[in-house]
Amino acid sequence: MKKEYIKSPMNYIGNKYRIMGQIQKWFPRKIDTMVDLFCGGCDVTINTDAQTHYANDINYHVIDIFTEFQKYSTDYILEYIDGTIKKWHLSKTDAEAYKMFRDYYNSTKEPLDLYILMCFSFNYQFRFNSNHDYNNPFGKDRSSFNDVMRANLIKTLDRLSNIHFTSKEFQNYDFGVLKQGDFLYADPPYLITCASYNDGKRGFTGWSEREEINLYSILTDLDKHGIKFALSNVIEHKGVKNDILAKWYRDNKYHLHRVNFNYNNSNYHAKNTDKVTKEVLVTNY
């Protein structure tokens, strides 16, 4: 029987919902403790069975939303969302109401309000300026807190109870929570793409060769301590190859698995079929 996956209510760019079936077939069959090092909207975390979950992301605004979700009942959260939408007259068409609510959020920084704001924003992006004010434009005629997002939110809320959330740069993460045989999943920004979340212009540190090399060094060290890992990445994009990734997995004799997917709603999609994006999953087991 085909497993039914839960889609995160975040609609995070680069999320793994549509390829969960592909990457999970290479995950360990039994997981005691799992760390999702770049969890984003938590699609992988909420869809992977483990005794204990740790979910981390540098974007503390997103982590604050999840920890806020953990504090309250599903009924309370839905009532808050519905009441706020009504109070501020938020809709697919009222750009002025959106801007007023965005200004209000930027003055209060209430996590649940940020979630609502994201629901009505362009492409559902979490985009911030250097002052960490939310600055994503209005998603006119496209974005809203619709019935599908409501259903996804309800399903997600049921899966958050045993997840420990943190917001740290990956270099500063406490890997001491992992013991031999445990599992780490890493879905970092992709070095050779130009996605909006790794350009260093969203209020958070960008991604460069330095971060790429540091991450691989950490994964190699975890491997030496008997910890299993799976790394999502792109090895080729529009004719550009990630030579750092290729050398690292070959030198360490890790396993490279091809993933068949195109990100049609972001900068990954290439019209020239000769220059498609080649996404992979690297495992050490």
Go through each PLM region and give its residues:
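Conserved S-adenosyl-L-methionine
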Residues: 26-86
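SAM-dependent nucleic-acid methyltransferase catalytic core
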Residues: 2-19, 25, 29, 74-185, ...
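Short helix/strand-bridging catalytic loops that position acidic/His residues to coordinate divalent metals
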Residues: 198-209
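Long, positively charged, glycine-interspersed low-complexity recognition regions
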Residues: 209-285
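Short, glycine/acidic-enriched loop or turn micro-motifs at the edges of active sites
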Residues: 39, 60, 172, 190, ...
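Active-site flanking residues adjacent to catalytic metal/cofactor-binding acidic residues
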Residues: 35, 56, 168, 186-188, ...
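A short acidic (Asp/Glu
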Residues: 46-48, 65, 176-177, 194-199, ...
